Regions:
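Short beta-strand/loop segments at the ligand-binding rim of alpha/beta enzyme cores
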Residues: 2, 95-103
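Charged catalytic cores and adjacent phosphate/nucleic-acid-binding surfaces used
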Residues: 1-11, 15-17, 21-26, 45-49, ...
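Aromatic-lined carbohydrate-recognition surfaces of secreted/lumenal glycan-active proteins
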Residues: 103-111
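Divalent metal-dependent hydrolysis catalytic cores, especially in the metallo-beta-lactamase
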Residues: 24-42, 101-103
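Active-site rim/loop-helix segments in enzyme catalytic domains that contact anionic ligands
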Residues: 52
Length: 226
């Protein structure tokens, strides 16, 4: 089958995200996604908890967005944490030892801890479309160039921190709806990135709700389900 997956989503287990597990599932279904990778910043806790407890036909792929010394790296199919602050090579090696797949995420986006030229052939894939990246077109073009140069598979994810943004970028994967099968297909290049930038209005609404949450102390997501 062909799986449609957003491979880069943050939940409330990331300090800068507003996405609750309930809203993650709601918007994943609304966007027609079969699978979502939860990639919280430097923690696997939420991804494992949600994957275990979610009663949904949307497959949860446990992952992490790791802060390496040289930029951010998405690890997919993880069951244990990855140390932050290591070099790119050390981080990728640790991901591989844990049985995960290492993705060079938003390698040329501004203000995102991007890897730039630290992306290497040690990675399993490059995130060529990141729907939250700025400037979007330049980010995609530069990421496509590095993926071609390194001869690596290309994937896409939203990098969503606000539930209505989920699914603006996604990856078609030629695999059964199974986590192990999906990540193996990605590493083998049986995948196709698709998507568009998150609209400015959603980015502004995210910041409005984020700062409102900080002021009021509310921990609930303010996303409107429309």
């Amino acid at each position: 089958m062909q799986v449609k997956a957003d491979l880069h989503v943050h939940t409330i287990y990331s300090r800068d995200s507003l996405i609750t597990p309930k809203d993650l599932v709601f918007y994943a279904k609304k966007r027609g996604l079969n699978a979502v990778a939860i990639t919280d910043h430097n923690t696997i806790e939420g991804a494992l908890k949600i994957a275990k407890e979610a009663e949904t036909d949307v497959l949860i792929i446990p992952g992490i967005e790791v802060s390496s010394r040289n930029g951010h790296i998405v690890a997919l199919n993880m069951q244990e944490p990855v140390s932050k602050g290591l070099s790119v090579e050390e981080t990728v090696d640790q991901i591989h030892r844990a049985g995960g797949v290492a993705v060079a995420c938003h390698p040329f986006a501004l203000l995102k801890g991007s890897l730039g030229k630290h992306a290497s052939g040690k990675f399993d894939a490059v995130e060529t479309i990141n729907a939250s990246a700025t400037p979007f077109k330049r980010s995609v073009r530069k990421a496509e160039e590095i993926a071609a140069q390194l001869k690596l598979p290309r994937v896409a994810g939203t990098d969503a921190h606000y539930a209505p943004a989920i699914g603006y970028a996604y990856t078609f994967i030629d695999a059964p709806l199974d986590v192990d099968a999906i990540v193996k297909a990605i590493a083998a290049g049986r995948c196709q990135p698709c998507g568009m930038p998150v609209p400015l209005r959603l980015k502004l609404k995210k910041y409005y709700h984020y700062f409102n949450q900080k002021i009021t102390g509310s921990k609930s997501n303010q996303a409107e389900r429309k």
